[in-house]
């Protein structure tokens, strides 16, 4: 099942997601959000959706796969942004000396933090956090923080880079399970296309690696020079 708290037809996701095998729900197609304003609330989406598949797993033992596409952190990050406004007090208290755009960005993205907090609480309450894997990544750096006058991304990241630096376009992939005994950091260069083969191997799934462009980032024979760019 897949969820997106924006218009379900945007970018034709109502066509692509079913072709990927998902039962897809978005605004206008079965996802009924209660918090008004743009961008919409990730916490609201999680509260409306997670209890059903968690309860089903507890009752039947049937594994679930839920795909979420977040929208709460979407630009722009003035106080007119619904999520920035919703979490303004917390962001300003945490970063009182930050510029307004940076405060607004943090405030908007706190909504995803709250959504994940809620999800983990529900998984732990159901006793299945140790049997759950969460895979999370982003699509791009917050380029809307860059204006003609000020590069607020430098303030946010603490790096004196520019849009011409490759380092700005590096991303992070978070893979978590409640059963992890300790954290693992992988510094091997990799790309989004490496996620599927890596997770497939961790789950012990059989697949033809010739049909996947990526590599398992934990593989001992991983050649970083072949990483996708």
Residue spans of the language-model regions?
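Solvent-exposed soluble domains appended to multi-pass membrane proteins
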Residues: 1-229
């Amino acid at each position: 099942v897949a969820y997106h708290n924006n218009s379900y037809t945007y970018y034709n996701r109502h066509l692509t997601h079913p072709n990927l095998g998902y039962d897809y729900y978005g605004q206008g197609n079965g996802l009924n959000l209660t918090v008004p304003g743009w961008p919409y609330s990730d916490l609201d989406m999680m509260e409306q959706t997670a209890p059903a598949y968690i309860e089903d797993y507890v009752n039947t033992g049937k594994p679930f796969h839920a795909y979420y596409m977040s929208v709460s952190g979407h630009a722009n990050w003035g106080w007119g942004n619904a999520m920035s406004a919703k979490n303004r007090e917390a962001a300003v208290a945490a970063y009182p000396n930050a510029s307004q755009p940076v405060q607004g960005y943090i405030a908007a993205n706190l909504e995803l933090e709250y959504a994940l907090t809620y999800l983990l609480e529900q998984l732990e309450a159901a006793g299945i956090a140790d049997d759950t894997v969460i895979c999370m990544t982003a699509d791009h750096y917050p380029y809307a923080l860059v204006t003609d006058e000020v590069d607020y991304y430098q303030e946010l990241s603490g790096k004196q880079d520019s849009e011409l630096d490759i380092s700005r376009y590096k991303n992070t992939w978070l893979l978590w399970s409640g059963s992890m005994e300790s954290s693992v950091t992988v510094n091997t260069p990799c790309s989004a296309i490496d996620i599927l083969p890596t997770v497939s191997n961790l789950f012990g799934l059989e697949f033809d690696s010739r049909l996947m462009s990526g590599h398992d980032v934990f593989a001992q024979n991983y050649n970083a020079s072949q990483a996708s760019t």
